[in-house]
């Protein structure tokens, strides 16, 4: 089967400019691309035909051979020196076309820049620091731009060279069936540059390992898991790319008195059994000092007293939480003989379980369970 004239395939005149040829090919490629015409074999054939025509007409040497000898001039089997289909013309157009369609566009030759990696630092602080806010200094390991080569990776007085494998694109095309796929260049690692004479300070990396000290402001009300972002304090970028960010993650230390629950605080308050039975006034700790609360008579262990506004005002809260005090009635120890005697007397004056409502309730449940 004879091949159609390549100018006819693209719908351009024989004296068409390179831009006209490229424009015509872009239009046909987008119209007949197999991804846009799944299962349409006719469209696939037209796509291949347009691709072949552009491969020849976009290359000045191949176009000249085609204009002089026709298809025989570019057929590798004819022996007339056309060179076959290896060139970069199609690759560039393919990249431009599908960069337009899918938002990519890897056809330029700008040095590839990469943003530096983000860093994480776990910071332990006390409950009081979290409640009131504080400022502290941290020391972190990171990668900074090399001061000797200023990030180029090349020895001073020399310059990186363009990677010959990818032509400075940082990516290469690998043919897979009828399609070509872009991949990171294995030779330059995607930078598009090669360093033949590396910098002695960074050994060609363009970045060096260092420790730096930063001051971090901790806002009042932070809690475990909260993150503080320090923009641009992460690792340095590559080829002049922007630095990453540093995320300081807050972790609260255990407190000897309080436990935090959101904006509320909890604490246990031991009281004597005499105070629990007769009532009284006790002094309890808060983050702002001490406060006094009245304990009513017959207070049971586990009773909770709420002090409103004595908790923590969270970062995103409009008002502070509460302090919840859990009463813990203590059993006396190290009793003297006189104290033991008085307790025995008290027990003797307590007929049945009337003075112990919980015990009475428990015994009633036991009797009900056994049916007695």
From Swiss-Prot:
It comes from the Bacteria. One of its GO terms (biological process) is chaperone cofactor-dependent protein refolding. Gene3D superfamilies: DnaJ domain (1.10.287.110), Heat shock protein DnaJ, cysteine-rich domain (2.10.230.10), Urease metallochaperone UreE, N-terminal domain (2.60.260.20). This is Chaperone protein DnaJ. The gene is dnaJ. NCBIfam families: DnaJ_bact, PRK10767.1. Keywords: Chaperone, Cytoplasm, DNA replication, Metal-binding, Repeat, Stress response, Zinc, Zinc-finger. The keyword Thylakoid does not apply. Zn(2+) 1 binds at residues 146, 149, 199, 202. Zn(2+) 2 binds at residues 163, 166, 185, 188. One of its GO terms (molecular function) is ATP binding. Homodimer. One of its GO terms (cellular component) is cytoplasm. Belongs to the DnaJ family. The J domain is necessary and sufficient to stimulate DnaK ATPase activity. Zinc center 1 plays an important role in the autonomous, DnaK-independent chaperone activity of DnaJ. Zinc center 2 is essential for interaction with DnaK and for DnaJ activity. Binds 2 Zn(2+) ions per monomer. Residues 5-70 form the J domain. CXXCXGXG motif repeats lie at residues 146-153, 163-170, 185-192, 199-206. A zinc finger (CR-type) spans 133-211. InterPro entries: DnaJ (IPR012724), DnaJ_C (IPR002939), DnaJ_domain (IPR001623), DnaJ_domain_CS (IPR018253), HSP40/DnaJ_pept-bd (IPR008971), HSP_DnaJ_Cys-rich_dom (IPR001305), HSP_DnaJ_Cys-rich_dom_sf (IPR036410), J_dom_sf (IPR036869). It is found in: Cytoplasm. It comes from Thiobacillus denitrificans (strain ATCC 25259 / T1). Participates actively in the response to hyperosmotic and heat shock by preventing the aggregation of stress-denatured proteins and by disaggregating proteins, also in an autonomous, DnaK-independent fashion. Unfolded proteins bind initially to DnaJ; upon interaction with the DnaJ-bound protein, DnaK hydrolyzes its bound ATP, resulting in the formation of a stable complex. GrpE releases ADP from DnaK; ATP binding to DnaK triggers the release of the substrate protein, thus completing the reaction cycle. Its cofactor is Zn(2+). Pfam families: DnaJ (PF00226), DnaJ_C (PF01556), DnaJ_CXXCXGXG (PF00684).
């Amino acid at each position: 089967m004879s091949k159609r004239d390549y100018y006819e395939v693209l719908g351009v005149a024989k004296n068409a400019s390179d831009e006209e040829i490229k424009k015509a090919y872009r239009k046909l490629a987008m119209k007949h691309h197999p991804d846009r015409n799944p299962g349409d074999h006719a469209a696939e054939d037209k796509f291949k035909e347009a691709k072949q025509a552009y491969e020849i007409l976009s290359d000045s040497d191949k176009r000249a051979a085609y204009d002089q000898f026709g298809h025989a001039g570019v057929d590798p089997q004819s022996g007339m020196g056309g060179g076959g289909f290896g060139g970069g013309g199609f690759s560039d157009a393919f990249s431009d076309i599908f960069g337009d369609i899918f938002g990519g566009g890897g056809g330029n030759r700008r040095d590839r820049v990469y943003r530096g990696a983000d860093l994480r630092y776990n910071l332990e602080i006390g409950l009081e620091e979290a409640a009131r806010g504080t400022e502290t200094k941290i020391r972190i390991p990171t990668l900074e731009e090399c001061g000797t080569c200023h990030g180029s990776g090349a020895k001073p007085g020399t310059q990186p060279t363009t990677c010959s494998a990818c032509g400075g694109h940082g990516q290469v095309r690998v043919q897979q069936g009828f399609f070509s796929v872009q991949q990171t260049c294995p030779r330059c690692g995607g930078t598009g540059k090669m360093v033949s004479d590396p910098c002695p300070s960074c050994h060609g990396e363009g970045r060096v390992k260092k420790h730096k000290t930063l001051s971090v402001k901790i806002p009042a009300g932070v809690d475990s898991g909260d993150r503080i972002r320090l923009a641009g304090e992460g690792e340095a970028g590559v080829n002049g790319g922007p630095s990453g960010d540093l995320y300081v993650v807050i972790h609260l230390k255990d407190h000897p008195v309080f436990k935090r629950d959101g904006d509320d605080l909890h604490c246990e308050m031991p009281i004597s059994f005499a105070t629990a039975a007769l009532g009284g006034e006790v002094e309890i700790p808060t983050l702002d000092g001490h406060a006094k609360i009245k304990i009513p008579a017959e207070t049971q262990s586990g009773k909770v007293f709420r002090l409103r506004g004595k908790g923590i005002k969270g970062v995103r809260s409009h008002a502070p939480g509460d302090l919840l005090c859990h009463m813990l009635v203590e059993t006396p120890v190290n009793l003297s003989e006189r104290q033991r005697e008085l307790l025995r007397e008290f027990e003797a004056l307590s007929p049945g379980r009337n003075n112990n409502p919980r015990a009475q309730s428990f015994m009633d449940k036991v009797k009900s369970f056994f049916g007695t």
